[in-house]
A protein has these predicted regions:
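Short, Lys/Arg-enriched N-terminal segments with co-localized hydrophobic residues
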Residues: 1-5
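Mid-chain, well-packed structural core segment of small domains
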Residues: 60-95
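Individual transmembrane alpha-helices with interfacial aromatic-anchor signatures
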Residues: 99-115
Length: 130
């Protein structure tokens, strides 16, 4: 049970550190003149790019071994889910390797996320006209 508690603590701390880094990027982009929403978008894009880079360098997996869900839940985990299969299957070529396998993990998330947004958008639209 003690190991399980430590896993929770490590996931919480590392996931929190990822969020702190994202907030630092947001603050920096804001200080450089971007509006709040644009700064948040730029910070998210930066985190995605950094996590894809760390995945390609095989560093992200080492972090994830210690952090567990702390690296999977933030947006960085989604970037890792797309980049990892792309790196793994690059030897099979760009079309049948990278292109075909890149969304094996993230594809269902995209499909169901899009479907849910359509349903919620329709419900919101109905709510606004009633």
């Amino acid at each position: 049970e003690r190991d399980e508690i430590m896993e929770f603590v490590k996931a919480f701390v590392i996931g929190g550190l990822i969020c702190v880094v994202g907030q630092i990027f947001t603050n920096c982009y804001g200080a450089w003149g971007l509006e709040k929403q644009d700064a948040g978008t730029a910070a998210s894009m930066t985190l995605v790019a950094l996590s894809a880079l760390l995945t390609g360098l095989s560093v992200y997996d080492d972090i994830a071994k210690h952090a567990g869900a702390g690296t999977l839940v933030p947006i960085t985990g989604f970037a890792n889910a797309i980049a990892a299969p792309a790196v793994e299957f690059k030897t099979e070529g760009f079309v049948l390797g990278v292109g075909a396998k890149m969304f094996t993990i993230a594809g269902p998330v995209i499909v169901y996320g899009l479907a849910a947004s359509v349903v919620y958008g329709f419900i919101y639209w109905l709510y606004t006209i009633l």
